[in-house]
Amino acid sequence: MKFSSIILLTLLICSMSIFGNCQVETNKKCQGGSCASVCRRVIGVAAGKCINGRCVCYP
């Protein structure tokens, strides 16, 4: 439950962002390419990529 509330809070802050370039960094390691399956599980959207060895999702 705690993890879900953190994600919801992050999405709320992102939706209030003036610039709209919010991202959700995960602890899931990756090696290049897409993180679509991870982002779909974490925030329900398949928009994400591997940055510095970690999946980063964009709502």
UniProtKB/Swiss-Prot annotation:
* Molecular-function annotations in GO: ion channel inhibitor activity; potassium channel regulator activity; toxin activity
SUPFAM superfamilies associated with the record: Scorpion toxin-like
| A Pfam family annotated for this UniProt entry | Toxin_2
Q: Report the sequence similarity comment from the record.
A: Belongs to the short scorpion toxin superfamily. Potassium channel inhibitor family. Alpha-KTx 15 subfamily.
Keyword list (alphabetical) reads:
Disulfide bond, Ion channel impairing toxin, Neurotoxin, Potassium channel impairing toxin, Pyrrolidone carboxylic acid, Secreted, Signal, Toxin
* Intrachain disulfide bonds: 30-50, 35-55, 39-57
Residues recorded with modification Pyrrolidone carboxylic acid = 23
Q: Name one GO cellular component term.
A: extracellular region
Q: Where is this site: Aromatic residue of the functional dyad?
A: 58
**Compartments in which it is found:** Secreted
Predominantly, its location class is secreted
Name of the protein: Potassium channel toxin alpha-KTx 15.5
Does the record bear Disulfide bond in its keywords?
Answer: yes
